Amino acid sequence: MKQFKLRQLLPVLAFSFFISCQSSDKEKTSKETIPAKTDPLAKASRENKNGWVYVHLEGSPSDIGYQHGYLLSNEIDTTIQALSYYLEHETKKDWAFYRQCARNFLWDKLDREYKDEINGIAAGLHAKQKNYDSLDITALNAMEELAFYYVPQLMDKEKAGSGDNKAPGNCSAFIATGSYTKDGKIVIGHNNWTEYIIGQHWNVIADVVPEKGNHMLMDCMPGFIHSGDDFVITSNGILITETTITGFKGFDTTGIPEFQRARKSAQYSNSIDDVIRIFNTGNNGGYANDWLIGDTKTNEVAKLELGLKDYRVWRSKDTAMIGSNFPSDPKLIADETTFKVNDKSSSPNARKMRMEKLVTNLKGKLDVETGEQIEADHYDAYHNVKINNKCVICGHIDEDKNGCAEWDLPAYYPMGAVQGKVTTADLAKDMKFWAHMGHPCGQDFIGAPFYKLHPQYAWQAKYLVEMKSYPWTLFEAKK
């Protein structure tokens, strides 16, 4: 009996010890300890379902972090291994470089709340014998803004133009309301475009109940304190998603990391205005996006196009707004991107044509079912053909002989749509959304035959074996 009680206390003791000891070069990264009899896992849970890992995280920032690190320890470990391997190959920067960035200009910009949560994740990992610290978790959360915004800036300093087309082409999305939807209320959908070696890990559904702010339900990668791709609904009726801005260039190391602004906008926004304000406060230009935002309380939707120097907002209670990695504001395009507005053969512009036609044709019919159809669509509006390539909403660059030059991806690069989500105002009020892991069209990616056909990508086989497609699944936050 004494041995059993000791085993029960081990996670608690490990958590208390780690949180009290964890530190960075400049400060103690957490001074919080918890009472010896408190179980940080008491309110947490985990469930595997149709390719997703659902986790319920609840409590103080330290508790939420510990629950996250403990319950997803293996997934975080595997993700960091794959990510560090991928980044070293593609950006020519090793994991030590990204940790150094976290130390030099990210950690000190974080709010105490998020430092405590990150320290908690590291504590949970240590309790499961995974040797990562707060710098690893910070670098993981900032992977997009560091690898594809900061590193290209360094490249340009060495050779002008060498950092062009490095901003990723992540995602297709829409948000609609009013006469465009079946019930006149908001419908929102998003599919995630990512390199498969990374995108296969974007398979967490995080149900987060913090001590302060909104209850959040979102998809994310293991170890993320934000959604990252992004798709999040909140208990206050705020819905947020995005697509990246192709050809964007700009990064300010003195600003607040994008991953904190994204998390904070979901956790503390009560209105569309709040989301816009939080994203603009301390903006570092990292992971520059067109943010699609909805408020179920007012039935209004908005698009926030946010660069580093420029931003613009569009709002309406009767519209369908789309995103496929194209910027819209002429000033932002001219000032901060290399985007080719008139190149209709590019992935962003071809998908824009298709999505505009779909939301017009489906006016008055948009709901979960039609949203799922949009995310799985395979019609190339530029070539007027049904096909698997870079120009379709459910992207398959791994089958495109031309690759995707606008994102600096060569022919047949294993990248495309890796998962999807959709919800309605009524579902969101109950903290529910539908999610699909793997290509929304239902097609599997199997590594062995792919590497045989395209041996230039066999280096990825170490961490990318397959990416299976699963059924659409309804997820619901715990009440």
Where do the PLM segments sit?
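Bacterial Sec-dependent N-terminal signal peptides
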Residues: M1-T33
